Regions:
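Juxtamembrane intracellular "pre-TM" segments in multi-pass secondary transporters
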Residues: 2-16, 191-221, 404
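Helix-loop boundary and gating motifs at the non-cytosolic
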Residues: 12-61, 215-222, 227-254
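Residue-level signature of mid-helix packing/kink "hotspots" within the transmembrane helices
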Residues: 34, 61-69, 153-154, 259-267, ...
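Helix-to-loop junctions at the C-terminal end of transmembrane segments
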Residues: 67-79, 265-277
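Structural signature of the two symmetry-related core transmembrane helices
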Residues: 82-96, 280-294
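Helix-loop junctions at membrane interfaces in 12-TM secondary transporters
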Residues: 99-110, 297-308
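Cytoplasmic helix-loop-helix junction between adjacent transmembrane helices
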Residues: 112-149
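Helix-loop junctions on the cytosolic side of multi-pass membrane transporters
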Residues: 131, 175, 186-200, 386-396
Length: 404
């Protein structure tokens, strides 16, 4: 076990004010992420095949892939706050353009652009959170960050399902408006970070550090497997639910269940998981993530699908806050944005290949897809459990200079 930590409420009260502002902006943005979870359903209703809809999600992932590298670089050079604001404004504009797509080429191009423009804020927000919070508080801070993220995720898809029942156009408009609100929050309330070293302007140092960081490699490899599973939630899960005869609103409710569980239970669960070695906690969580979606192979009722989502969510709540804090502890402050960007690349790979391969596999055999997800969860657990040890406080845990 790791050393004793302060009580949860004391840890939350100790978080600086800008952290709470970042949480609020994250909630706004995620609440309004209406379009992507419903894009496959929207496109199939327009007459596109599931495989074509999967390509659009893959194109979004390709844009997300580029966004991780661009966002990581901008976070370390332009600054965290400006990067967040620029991403939100450009993301809002591309969502409005995506609403006008009617051809496959249009969906592919604009989905890729939306993935780039609307997602390059992520390395900046993760880096800013790590900048503002000392190492001993990072598990709680990242858990609270995810609570804000998932509070939006809990209410957003349910709201989107209601809006979609009236008009899918409102999904695009609402997505754009909430992005603009986050941009305003970033401009007026978030601090400006200044990189501590001039060498932060060059990718060479970051790539050299990453190339020799074996612990980082293990995290990345495990994340690749887990990302494939996670992104079935916004690609094949909706089709699986509707193929069983249930409505898009049912899919929205199942997605919201995931968010509600995280909002109410992840922080209390963190008070337990932060006491144990990080890699061991991550391995248990990853295995449960695989078991949850693996169970979908045998789930045919709403209750069974909800049960599968509950197991998946338990694994998510156990693993992800600890893995986020573990990653933050690995990163040198002046390279933090690019470390976070490279980490994000693995999730983009999962989005690209997870959605495309997942859609293809789903078209041939839904059971094979979900059983593959189960196997990948155990693969990720095996990778991350090697060299089990607690997260240590290293010389990488200094802060960046902050100015307003």
């Amino acid at each position: 076990m790791n050393p004793t930590h302060p009580p949860l409420l004391a840890s939350l009260r100790a978080l600086p004010r800008p952290v709470w502002i970042l949480f609020f902006g994250t909630f706004l943005n995620k609440f309004g992420s209406f379009v992507i979870p419903f894009l496959t359903i929207y496109m199939t209703r327009l007459g596109f095949s599931p495989a074509q809809a999967g390509l659009a999600i893959g194109a979004y992932g390709a844009g997300n892939f580029v966004a991780c590298a661009v966002g990581g670089h901008l976070a370390d050079t332009l600054g965290r706050r400006r990067t967040i604001m620029l991403s939100m404004i450009s993301g809002a504009l591309t969502m409005l353009l995506l609403s006008q797509a009617r051809t496959l080429s249009g969906f592919l191009a604009l989905s890729a652009l939306a993935g780039l423009a609307g997602e390059f804020y992520r390395p900046a927000s993760s880096a800013l959170l790590a900048d503002l919070v000392p190492p001993g508080q990072r598990v709680v801070a990242f858990s609270a960050f995810r609570m804000a993220f998932n509070a939006g995720w809990a209410f957003g898809p349910a709201t989107a399902g209601f809006l979609a029942a009236h008009s899918y156009t409102w999904l695009f408009v609402g997505d754009a408006l909430t992005s603009l609100l986050f941009a305003a929050v970033a401009w007026f309330a978030l601090p400006r970070t200044v990189p501590a070293k001039s060498s932060a302007n060059h990718w060479a140092e970051a790539l050299k550090a990453i190339r020799h960081d074996r612990k980082f490699h293990q995290v990345i490899c495990a994340s690749l497997a887990i990302a494939f599973i996670f992104f079935q939630m916004i690609s094949t899960l909706g089709l699986h639910i509707t193929s069983l005869g249930f409505s898009a609103a049912t899919y929205g409710a199942i997605i919201s269940l995931n968010g509600v569980l995280v909002v109410f239970f992840e922080l209390p669960l963190t008070t337990i998981t932060r006491r144990f070695p990080a890699r061991r906690v991550m391995a248990i969580g990853y295995a449960l993530v695989g078991i949850g979606f693996g169970f979908l192979a045998f789930a045919h009722s709403v209750a069974e699908i909800a049960f599968a989502m509950m197991i998946f969510t338990l694994g998510e709540m156990i693993a992800i806050p600890v893995s986020s804090a573990y990653l933050a502890d690995l990163t040198p402050p002046h390279l933090r944005g690019r470390y976070m960007g490279v980490s994000g690349l693995t999730w983009s790979f999962g989005l690209i290949f997870g959605s495309c391969l997942g859609m293809t596999l789903f078209s041939h055999s839904p059971m094979a897809l979900w059983l593959s997800c189960g196997a990948l969860g155990f693969v990720a657990a095996a990778i991350i459990s090697r060299d089990i040890q607690p997260v240590g406080e290293t010389n990488r845990c200094e802060f960046l200079d902050l100015s307003h």
